[in-house]
Amino acid sequence: HAGSYASARRLLAHLAAHAPEQHRRVIFVESSEAKLRALEHHRASPLPTVLLSPSLREGVDLPDDFLRFQIVTKMPYPDLGDPWTAARQARDPRWYALETAKALVQAYGRSCRHADDYGVTYILDAQFARFVQRYRPLLPGWFRDAAEPALRAAKARGW
C-alpha cells in the first residue's frame, strides 16, 4: 500500500534502479480503473507477483496464497488537502483519528480473509507507533495484540 500514486512511482523507479530482479515481480496499479486488470494478472500469474498501489486498501479480496504479506508504506490518514476533510478534522479531531484507524484496520484485513488464512503486515511509517499509543482505544483488541510485539521491538531498537 503506497500513500499515493506519486510515491508508488518513486518506489517502482527505486526498485528498477537498485533491485531489477524484484522490480520484474511488481504489478503497478496505475489508477483505480486499472485495479481489476491488475488483480486478474496477479491471480493468473504462475510466478509470484507483488501489487503496488494506493488503491488496494479496500474492496479487494486476495485470500490464501494471493496475499501472504503486505507493506503499508504510509499511515492512511485522510487527505487534509481536501477542504471537506480539513474542515471536518478541524471541527472534530477524533473523527480524523477514527477514519485513520478504520482505514488502517481495513488495510490490515486484506491479508486475512477467513479463519484459516494468514499473512504478515509491515507498516513502515514512523507515525504508526505514535498513532497506536495515542489512539489505542480506537483500535480493536486483536489489532493491538498483533501490533504490540512489533512496537516493543521497535522501541527496544530505538526506532
Located regions from the model:
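Conserved RecA-like P-loop NTPase helicase motor core
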Residues: 30-131
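A generic structural motif
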Residues: 23-38, 145-159
